[in-house]
Design a protein with these regions (language model features):
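Metal-dependent catalytic cores of enzymes that make or break cyclic nucleotides
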Residues: 82, 89, 93-275
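Alpha4 helix (beta4-alpha4-beta5 surface) of REC/receiver domains from two-component response regulators
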Residues: 3, 7, 12-13, 23-38
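Alpha4-beta5-alpha5 switch/output surface of CheY-like receiver
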Residues: 1, 24-28, 45, 141, ...
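Amphipathic alpha-helical coiled-coil "transmission" helices that mediate dimerization
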Residues: 51, 58-86, 90, 94-97, ...
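C-terminal output helix
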Residues: 40-53, 57
Length: 275
């Protein structure tokens, strides 16, 4: 009975006290091994039994309170980490003459693609929260390059490309799943399906799936958003470019999934306008 109680998640935390005529220490050890919290041999004294029951119930309540407190603090820590990631992502966008809505929109677009690709909700949510960090490395790019209104020359473009590696360095190698995925996104979202991207020239499925997803979301939102140096593209023109670059810049399978989500994409775009 004790083994059954302890093996069921619903009843596993119920304190079990053995009351038995078996007084051998081996029997007592076996009862405790099975999960009992106490072992009382007969003859018994009702006041003593009642006292020990109260003690174990109090200990059980205290353990439950501690578990709840740990869970609450863990959630608070997770929320704090999430807020820091979001703030860093927005900070990078503001340095680049972009609004904070860019990271919000493209994060939603990325989650739409992820949800069409996989039914793993935890992974989709994690990607949604990691996506704002895609351009955090721009913090390390000089203003003379980052804010230049015209085209970059060859040297400036080479330096701009380092922002992917800067982003990975800023995020670091922390084992936290959110930061790990943020690092992947920062490092891989400028890789291209045909291997012509940067920083590593990865090709095809060698590019992490998260980087391939964010690449589509980022480019689409950048094209359809107005900037000091360019007008916003019409949605149809941006969609056509994404289509035309399937198999070269973008993963063709993910492009198809993105195109299937266009109605939801347009809803998100209207929900978070720059103006």
């Amino acid at each position: 009975v004790c083994s059954s109680l302890k093996s069921d998640p619903i009843t596993s935390e119920i304190p079990v006290i053995f009351i038995t005529a078996k007084s051998d220490t081996k029997d007592e050890a076996y009862g405790l091994f099975l999960g009992a919290c106490d072992y009382i041999t007969k003859p018994i004294s009702p006041p003593i039994v009642q006292g020990r029951v109260r003690t174990h119930l109090n200990l059980h309540d205290q353990n439950r309170s501690l578990q709840d407190a740990v869970k609450e603090r863990t959630e608070e820590l997770h929320n704090t980490q999430l807020k820091i990631v979001q703030c860093l992502g927005r900070a990078a966008e503001f340095r680049d003459n972009e609004t904070g809505f860019h990271v919000i929109r493209m994060s939603h677009y990325a989650r739409l693609i992820a949800e069409a690709y996989s039914d793993n909700k935890s992974w989709c949510d994690l990607l949604f929260n990691a996506a704002p960090m895609h351009d955090v490395g721009k913090i390390g790019i000089p203003d003379s390059i980052l804010l230049k209104p015209g085209a970059l020359d060859a040297d400036e473009w080479e330096q701009m490309q380092h922002h992917a590696e800067y982003g990975a360095t800023i995020i670091g190698n922390d084992p936290n799943p959110l930061l790990q995925l943020s690092r992947i996104v920062a490092l891989a979202h400028h890789e291209k399906w045909d291997g012509s991207g940067y920083p590593s020239g990865l090709k095809g499925e060698d590019i992490p799936i998260e980087g391939r997803i964010v690449a589509i979301a980022d480019v689409f939102d950048a094209l359809t958003s107005a900037r000091p140096y360019k007008e916003a593209w019409p949605t149809e023109k941006a969609i056509a470019l994404i289509k035309d670059n399937a198999g070269s810049h973008f993963d063709p399978e993910l492009v198809e999934l993105f195109l299937q989500q266009i109605p939801q994409v347009l809803e998100i775009k209207s929900q978070y306008p720059d103006d």
